[in-house]
Curated annotation (Swiss-Prot):
Protein name as it appears in the record: Prefoldin subunit beta
Protein source organism: Archaeoglobus fulgidus (strain ATCC 49558 / DSM 4304 / JCM 9628 / NBRC 100126 / VC-16)
Highest taxon, organism lineage: Archaea
Cystine bridges: none
CDD domains recorded: Prefoldin_beta_GimC
InterPro entries: PFD_beta-like, PfdB, Prefoldin
Subunit details: Heterohexamer of two alpha and four beta subunits.
Keyword Cytoplasm annotated: yes
Amino acid sequence: MGELPPQVQNLVAQLQQLQQQLQAVITQRAQVEALLRDTEQALEELQKVDDETPVYKAVGNILVKEKKEDVIKELTEKKETYEIRIKTLQRQEEKLRERFAETQQKLQNLLSPQAG
């Protein structure tokens, strides 16, 4: 068996690159989804607390007393940002999967005549 033709080598390299990009996007999405879950959980807990209960927010290594409504507003904004980021990452993931499938098909088409 000889060396693979340059076109095949190029497609294999493209597939590897797409696979790495896809894995990076999947990892990012999982991280942002975890942040979203944490934020939603914090918002749920804040809803249970009455307005007179002191609320503290972590700032670096210290806790700072904050107004409950300010913390809720900040967490709600973070939640919305995370949701937008997740949608963006999902679209990127979808496009990468499509490109991966197309490139894989091109590679199979190139290799199938050689298989016979």
